[in-house]
Amino acid sequence: MKKNQFLKESDVTAESVFFMKRRQVLKALGISATALSLPHAAHADLLSWFKGNDRPPAPAGKALEFSKPAAWQNNLPLTPADKVSGYNNFYEFGLDKADPAANAGSLKTDPWTLKISGEVAKPLTLDHDDLTRRFPLEERIYRMRCVEAWSMVVPWIGFPLHKLLALAEPTSNAKYVAFETIYAPEQMPGQQDRFIGGGLKYPYVEGLRLDEAMHPLTLMTVGVYGKALPPQNGAPVRLIVPWKYGFKGIKSIVSIKLTRERPPTTWNLAAPDEYGFYANVNPYVDHPRWSQATERFIGSGGILDVQRQPTLLFNGYADQVASLYRGLDLRENF
């Protein structure tokens, strides 16, 4: 596998200071413009009003043992850990970027069960310890590109999904892989209340073609910055597919099911004209309401210092993954 294409130092996200454009979609789903314009403090008050204000802080992640394959290491300064953990989309905990960090401490991640089922010869069930002990862990420094046209560079820790799927032995009927987030409305206020969760249908679901899932880049991620994932980043296990937009990176996974037919995916169900099944990073295919030709790397000085640079096809991983889509019209299959 080829080594990562190097980024400039200015490419690394340093601060969370820009606006959510998907709010227009949420308004179409019935969430009021007034609610969407509320500042974070007001969102916090609303969460308290719906759920009470005694939310525990997220526990500190434990240190993990992992290797650092040379192909995925470089000397770039990384997005600061507090920005990666403090600036998230995880609508189960609220719409504001700061809501997941503020509210995800209520998520219980141990014990945990992850089931692999469907078109497999050997269905599997993994517990919390299996996620960090059954497979050798490695750190991979990946670009992360949000569909909202911002990006980060993050040192994820995990294991290739293909290793897990190989244990389950997909049958010849398996063509797709369906993923599902935990459904726990008593712990996730956005699942309990349509207002808080943006009107999406829960549990959150995602999917990949089997060949995408089996690609060496596709990572079952259990840690970041040397420690177990914090709840707001998708603990205890999430998906990272670095050549796709971030909403494909489903968090807090409890089910992986291999299927014959293409599975439904949450954002495609919510707005099929805006969020496709493939969701490959592509500067030549714009979102209906904004350009994807460039992306924002957010500097420490605030929104006026945000630097914009060209978006890379497949988020810079074209050499590794373009062959998966040979002959596929990427405009029609966005």
Swiss-Prot record:
Cellular-component GO terms for this entry: periplasmic space
- Which GO terms label this protein's molecular function in UniProt? metal ion binding; molybdopterin cofactor binding; oxidoreductase activity, acting on a sulfur group of donors, quinone or similar compound as acceptor
Processing after translation? Predicted to be exported by the Tat system. The position of the signal peptide cleavage has not been experimentally proven.
Tell me which positions the record assigns to the signal sequence. Answer: 1-44
Q: Which reaction does it catalyse?
A: L-methionyl-[protein] + a quinone + H2O = L-methionyl-(S)-S-oxide-[protein] + a quinol; L-methionyl-[protein] + a quinone + H2O = L-methionyl-(R)-S-oxide-[protein] + a quinol
What are the UniProt keywords, alphabetically? Metal-binding, Molybdenum, Oxidoreductase, Periplasm, Signal
> What Enzyme Commission number(s) appear in the record?
1.8.5.-
- InterPro entries given for it? MsrP (IPR022867), OxRdtase_Mopterin-bd_dom (IPR000572), OxRdtase_Mopterin-bd_sf (IPR036374), TAT_signal (IPR006311)
Record Gene3D superfamilies: Oxidoreductase, molybdopterin-binding domain (3.90.420.10)
First-level EC class: oxidoreductase
Question: What is the cofactor note?
Answer: Binds 1 Mo-molybdopterin (Mo-MPT) cofactor per subunit.
Give an example GO biological process.
protein repair
Instruction: Report the main location listed first in the record.
Output: periplasm
Name the positions where Mo-molybdopterin binds. 88, 91-92, 146, 181, 233, 238, 249-251
Q: Where in the cell is it found?
A: Periplasm
Which co-factors does it depend on?
A: Mo-molybdopterin
Q: Which Pfam families match?
A: Oxidored_molyb
- Primary role: Part of the MsrPQ system that repairs oxidized periplasmic proteins containing methionine sulfoxide residues (Met-O), using respiratory chain electrons. Thus protects these proteins from oxidative-stress damage caused by reactive species of oxygen and chlorine generated by the host defense mechanisms. MsrPQ is essential for the maintenance of envelope integrity under bleach stress, rescuing a wide series of structurally unrelated periplasmic proteins from methionine oxidation, including the primary periplasmic chaperone SurA and the lipoprotein Pal.
What family, per the record? Belongs to the MsrP family.
How it assembles, according to the record, is: Heterodimer of a catalytic subunit (MsrP) and a heme-binding subunit (MsrQ).
| Name by which UniProt lists this protein | Protein-methionine-sulfoxide reductase catalytic subunit MsrP
What species was this sequence derived from?
Answer: Escherichia coli (strain K12 / MC4100 / BW2952)
UniProt lists the gene as msrP
